[in-house]
Amino acid sequence: MGDVRLSALSTLNYRNLAPGTLNFPEGVTGIYGENGAGKTNLLEAAYLALTGQTDAPRIEQLIQAGETEAYVRADLQQGGSLSIQEVGLGRGRRQLKVDGVRARTGDLPRGGAVWIRPEDSELVFGPPSGRRAYLDSLLSRLSARYGEQLSRYERTVSQRNAALRGGEEWAMHVWDDVLLKLGTEIMLFRRRALTRLDELAREANAQLGSRKTLALTLTESTSPETYAADLRGRRAEELARGSTVTGPHRDDLLLTLGDFPASDYASRGEGRTVALALRRAELELLREKFGEDPVLLLDDFTAELDPHRRQYLLDLAASVPQAIVTGTELAPGAALTLRAQAGRFTPVADEEMQAEGTA
């Protein structure tokens, strides 16, 4: 059917964005402006509308101050067909619709979008929870079943923790049976997917000019073979702590650069390169799985990057069917350029671009 294209994005009461609709062409759309002008919020809204996912700790953070609801809508074209994806946001809730019908995240186009941003360095230097979230987000898009089983697993862990806090040791065998089934499936899926993700990230890291080999491995708190024994063996500890201490929710995605963990030994520049390699691997894995390119969302293409890596990102944006690139500078080669000011985005004429470029 061809690649999915974002033809228009509409927002209402979303962070600092002015209400309205922006139309996007194929190719690169460049958005430039000062920090705080709304560029990142626009990409966040696009990513939410395209994938149904957000990493905001609370939904309320996405809603403008003084408002109780927010709304984003993506008009998508694929081949000759048009589809509309909507996300309604309220206090503690998120509602998805596809062509007016309520939907789940798994019902959205699986490729969707890949969002590259300066904060991705936290994938390298931040806590294990961020790396798990990266992996789970990607795998949920590769497999709707993975996302469903992960949600069931997380609910089960929460319910089991409540039973542990209540001292309900008698109920553990019931929860353990459910955990074993769900957790084992999650671990096995992660292992299979990581084989290819590791290969792609290694290639991307080399293309970015790193002379150190990147490797991705799972640091697991248990294994499918020992899971049942580990749950039984740590029962007393879990009752004392009131929480489930073993399972895939405690795993880490270990990033090794050369012979050492990147989180401990990589420089800031090396960490940024590793993060870019992860996002490039994400894009390639989605492309391989679904046979189409995600929309590339590239936030602040000049941030913390040397000229080689900056050009790498610009070349990547030019190589995909559609990309939205933001920065404090003009993005070269854009089919459309928008200026961001106080949450509003206005087209920039060729004459203005030439003046900006020589200023």
From Swiss-Prot:
<keyword id="KW-0234">DNA repair</keyword>
<protein>
    <recommendedName>
        <fullName>DNA replication and repair protein RecF</fullName>
    </recommendedName>
</protein>
<dbReference type="GO" id="GO:0003697">
    <property type="term" value="F:single-stranded DNA binding"/>
</dbReference>
<keyword id="KW-0067">ATP-binding</keyword>
<keyword id="KW-0963">Cytoplasm</keyword>
<dbReference type="GO" id="GO:0005737">
    <property type="term" value="C:cytoplasm"/>
</dbReference>
<dbReference type="GO" id="GO:0009432">
    <property type="term" value="P:SOS response"/>
</dbReference>
<dbReference type="GO" id="GO:0006302">
    <property type="term" value="P:double-strand break repair"/>
</dbReference>
<dbReference type="GO" id="GO:0005524">
    <property type="term" value="F:ATP binding"/>
</dbReference>
<comment type="function">
    <text>The RecF protein is involved in DNA metabolism; it is required for DNA replication and normal SOS inducibility. RecF binds preferentially to single-stranded, linear DNA. It also seems to bind ATP.</text>
</comment>
<dbReference type="InterPro" id="IPR042174">
    <property type="entry name" value="RecF_2"/>
</dbReference>
<dbReference type="InterPro" id="IPR003395">
    <property type="entry name" value="RecF/RecN/SMC_N"/>
</dbReference>
<keyword id="KW-0235">DNA replication</keyword>
<keyword id="KW-0742">SOS response</keyword>
<keyword id="KW-0227">DNA damage</keyword>
<feature type="binding site">
    <location>
        <begin position="33"/>
        <end position="40"/>
    </location>
    <ligand>
        <name>ATP</name>
    </ligand>
</feature>
<keyword id="KW-0547">Nucleotide-binding</keyword>
<keyword id="KW-0238">DNA-binding</keyword>
<dbReference type="InterPro" id="IPR018078">
    <property type="entry name" value="DNA-binding_RecF_CS"/>
</dbReference>
<dbReference type="Pfam" id="PF02463">
    <property type="entry name" value="SMC_N"/>
</dbReference>
<dbReference type="InterPro" id="IPR001238">
    <property type="entry name" value="DNA-binding_RecF"/>
</dbReference>
<dbReference type="GO" id="GO:0000731">
    <property type="term" value="P:DNA synthesis involved in DNA repair"/>
</dbReference>
<dbReference type="GO" id="GO:0006260">
    <property type="term" value="P:DNA replication"/>
</dbReference>
<comment type="similarity">
    <text>Belongs to the RecF family.</text>
</comment>
<dbReference type="InterPro" id="IPR027417">
    <property type="entry name" value="P-loop_NTPase"/>
</dbReference>
